[in-house]
Amino acid sequence: MEQIISQVVKQLFDQDISVQLTRPDPKFGDFATNVALQLAKPLGKNPREIAEMIAENLRKEEDFSEVSVAGPGFINVKLSDQSVLNSLKKEPTTKRAGQTVVIETNCPNPFKAMHIGHALNAILADTMANLLAVDGAIVHRVSYHGDVGTHVGKSMWAILREIDGDVNKLNEIPTDKRNEFMSRMYVEGARAAKESPEAKAEIDELAKQSFVLDDPLYKQVYEICKSWSFDEIDSNVGRLGNVPIERRYVESETEELGKSLIKEKTPEVFTKSDGAYVFKGSKYGAFDNVFIGSHGNGLYGAHDMGLIQLKYKDYPNLDLSITVNGEEQAAYFRGVIAASELSIPALKGKLFNYATGLVKLTTGKMSSRTGEVVTIGWLFDEFKKAIENAGGEPTDDVIAGALRYQFLKVKIGGDVIFDINDAVSLTGNTGSYLQYAHARARGILAKSDKEIAFPTGLFDEDKMLVRKLSEYVDVVDRAKESLEPHHVCTYLFELAQEFNRYYEKNQVIGSDKEAHRVGIVAIYADILKAGLAILGIVAPNKI
């Protein structure tokens, strides 16, 4: 449609213009454009006059049943029934076809419990990867984990005290209790570091040991517990519905690479000051940050620059590299990206970080440093109880669907207000509601003995629903372009509501229009399923 309007503008005014379409109130039309207002200044004409000229030409198009002009020059277009039906056969565009995209997902650190904030970032990144794949990109899911440093020292301090020099005591911990054990160890270490100067000094030494691993007992315990952590992370993100990663990066393999590049790019990119290497990030919307300390150790910035090099080495045809992190790290990542692009010019414009908001509970912001966390294990247990209390069957697919949707329906960067009972409701804007809506539609189709066929025409009662169905491709294209899954969530919820209104007023099974209506129901069910798949949510046939 944009192309048709652009051609009319070119023919009438010899102007090349990018036509933007919006969805007005359905009573005004299916699409609206302000192209006449855009043309008013370059043409020196009244926008209403321009709009009338464009509208007159658009009325000749058989795809449009009605074209009107409103206000100062807005053009409203209503599609013909056949055009609406044809639009249901459209597929989303694939503007990123052939592009190579690397996206970090499933990235909690080992030696700590995976909590609800980790789940938000992992689910969002996984869904963005789905959108990129729908857009034609070759998507590589990878993960990055901090396996060295202070948090490791805290956990190892408590673990070594717990086993008292006997590594075999770790074998006595049941598999299903390992995550609880690791979480408890981290909390004990964090508390000790805060309360005891002596313990903090010991923890600092144990943190240093995580970089060198030259103590046999430490190394053995470290490797066992690190493996436990990764097993737990993989299990948890699998239960969340995430696609498995293809490459796991860890912080211990990045430092030397990062330090080497930073030193090579000094003073071109970095400044050396009192033995430290500093990036003047304040010039790039970030803050001045030390990447290598005066002690010679690489800090977070050096590690992240090493990671970027590893990804570029593993994926030399990289077109886009995406990370997803909390809003508190947004300025830091602006600095890392700026430093990386200056150091490796081939990556300019290819590195992006998306900042998420907070997950807000009644107890406030979570912190794994104090143990005030909602772990994934606890979260799944609570969802299971809530679904059972609501009369549902708490399968992993249903739990994951409710949880994912609760995160994804919020615009990226917005805070997620988390209420488990609301999240599993079958009557609100929830994943459970949409899964139920899909199962209900499949149930209707299962009751019909009519052959499912694509509608050949529309009755008046069909038009609101079918026009809503026709919006799907545009919504997905918008979500793909901005990498914002909430557009898909909003659309699917509105679509399910529209179908409910249709179904309440129009009998399907046993109606003299049954054959026609099951065709519409089938399209509705297929679109629901496709939209839920983008969100990483299973569309069950029964629930």
Predicted regions mapped to residue ranges:
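NTP-dependent nucleotidyl-transfer catalytic core
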Residues: 10, 14-38, 42-543
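N-proximal, solvent-exposed amphipathic alpha-helical segments enriched in charged/polar residues
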Residues: 1-13
